[in-house]
Amino acid sequence: MYKKQIFCFVGETNSGKDTIVNKICEMDKRFSTVVSYTSRPKRDNETDGVEHHFVDSDTIKDIMDKRPDDVVAYTKISQDLSSSGYEYLATIDELDKGNIYIIDPHGIEYLRSKFGDIYEIIAIYIYTPLEIRRKRAKNRSDYTTEFAKRVENESVQFDHYYRHKKYDYIIYNIDGCLDAAVTTVYGLLTYIIGGGLRRECTSALGNIYTKKEIYDGLTYLKMIFTYYLNNFTSRTLILEDIQKKYEIMRNIILSHLK
């Protein structure tokens, strides 16, 4: 049974996940974000209906009360000790329109448990060290009690998420190079939608791989290993088990070229 793939991106505050996702959606129209509802104010560089649907808290409450079965995720983020915080909510109709969703770890588990029979939920964790995230916050003039509070709130949640390997893929953005991160994540996504990593383990059972799937696999490997050959002293973007995946995919490709 075919399931639509939903790529769920998770990462701590200022990890770069929003920038990575936005650049990928600009590069390739096969990818589009799930537009959630939020009660936070719209920023100057945002457009209603693009980044979010900007609504008030009453509208979000109304959706939750009248359409509870349509709610796929809900998050409330406190800004400081004196604030009631902002709310974020996503509905199943918005999930049907997009295939990339920026979400928190708890939201992924909820999606898998409630909608796993409808969607293939693929979790991608963007890991960026705290020092780099703190530097970004300072550069963007939002290094305030808000950032410190969010870091504190996220530490337990993401530590559990990381230690128990709730993700499918993890990108280590060690030195904070977003351009390289975009290249790697884009290669990974095109590889997956072409059938790549998710079907490697069944290749021995006689799966027939299309030219498109082989091309996507080669493209992904080329992008990853070209980067490493040109930047072999860097520790940026270490994809887990990449050498093993390379050998598996290489053997699959060679078998089709015989």
State each model region's role.
Residues 9:
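Hydrophobic anchor at the beta1->P-loop junction of P-loop NTPases
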Residues 12:
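P-loop (Walker A) phosphate-binding loop of NTP-binding proteins
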Residues 18:
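Walker A/P-loop
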Residues 38-107:
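ATP-dependent small-molecule kinase phosphotransfer cores
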Residues 142-231, 237-239, 246-249:
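Small-molecule kinase domains that catalyze NTP-dependent phosphoryl transfer to phosphate-bearing small molecules
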